[in-house]
Amino acid sequence: GYSASNGVEEALEARVKPRNLPHSALETMEFQLGLFDGLPADVQRRYLMDVVDGIPDITKELDGMIAAWQRGDAEGLARLMNEDEEEPAMMDALITQRNRTWATWVQSRLDKPGTVFVAVGAGHLAGDGSVQAQLAARGITAHRVQ
């Protein structure tokens, strides 16, 4: 089954900590929770109800998303992730604006010496507003690593 203990953050932390590699997050948990708080109350309620209503299908949906990502099918992943999304304000706040901010950070970081590894959730790597699309708009090419 799916478990937070098997998440990307935990896997990365397990690799960097013993090697004393510097690491940080692009965002804090408080910032992420604040994204919801900044949305209109009716949008928050609809989103909560959509999440609750979708619980019975979550494993099937996650399996489909993981399969699309493993195939390298970013557009298929974007379709699966956004098929139930009826709130443009939600998508803009949770995905597009954050992708734009991260792309700006990456662009700025490329002007500094050293190597940086950036990991973000798969939902940020698919669709028109993806991190890659935001980077491409700045003339930066990103490549998916298997």
Functional labels for PLM-detected ranges:
Residues 1-111, 130-131:
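Hydrophobic, often amphipathic alpha-helical segments used for membrane interaction and targeting
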Residues 115-146:
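C-terminal structured interaction module
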